[in-house]
């Protein structure tokens, strides 16, 4: 009986962790200006490369800032950050192009400096993920879909509502 209680408690903890992750992805995707699906696929690729969600978020936010500032680093890599109509390309598309350039570069100070210039303090940590190139990122995204790891916007919203309801209950109970 005690083993059953322990197993149930473990299952509840795993379920709550999955709900918390979906909620966090939903909120982070809004801050980063990308879909929950795209972010959850990137999170999977990042995790396989040793980068946590916080580091990925820091790096992608820095990428967006550098794109808006028209950083020289993109020119050094021959990566276009604008569409033909002059609007900024999506950060996910630019990330793929940057990853292709990184995949073809030797590891060393130049690569690290470019990573830090584009992705801020998370840049060096993101190099293993970038070294996979856009094809590697796409393969990891497909794998995320195949193993059921990709979170959609509807699931993230449901997780957010669930956690908000729990927070309200805890507040009502004085917790």
Each language-model region and where it sits:
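Low-complexity, glycine/alanine/serine/threonine- and acidic/polar-rich repeat/linker tracts characteristic
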Residues: 1-16, 20-23, 27-37, 41-51, ...
């Amino acid at each position: 009986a005690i083993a059953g209680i322990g197993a149930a408690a473990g299952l509840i903890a795993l379920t709550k962790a999955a709900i918390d992750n979906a909620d966090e992805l939903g909120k982070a995707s809004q801050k980063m200006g990308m879909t929950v699906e795209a972010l959850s696929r990137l999170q999977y690729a990042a995790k396989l490369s040793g980068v946590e969600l916080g580091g990925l978020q820091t790096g992608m936010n820095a990428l967006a800032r550098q794109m808006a500032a028209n950083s020289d680093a993109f020119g050094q890599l021959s990566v276009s950050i604008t569409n033909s109509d002059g609007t900024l390309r999506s950060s996910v598309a630019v990330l793929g192009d940057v990853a292709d350039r990184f995949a073809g570069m030797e590891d060393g100070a130049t690569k690290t400096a470019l990573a830090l210039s584009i992705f801020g303090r998370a840049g060096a940590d993101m190099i293993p993920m970038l070294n996979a190139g856009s094809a590697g990122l796409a393969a990891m995204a497909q794998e995320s879909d195949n193993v059921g790891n990709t979170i959609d916007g509807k699931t993230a919203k449901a997780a957010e509502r669930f956690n908000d309801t729990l927070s309200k209950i805890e507040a009502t109970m004085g917790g």
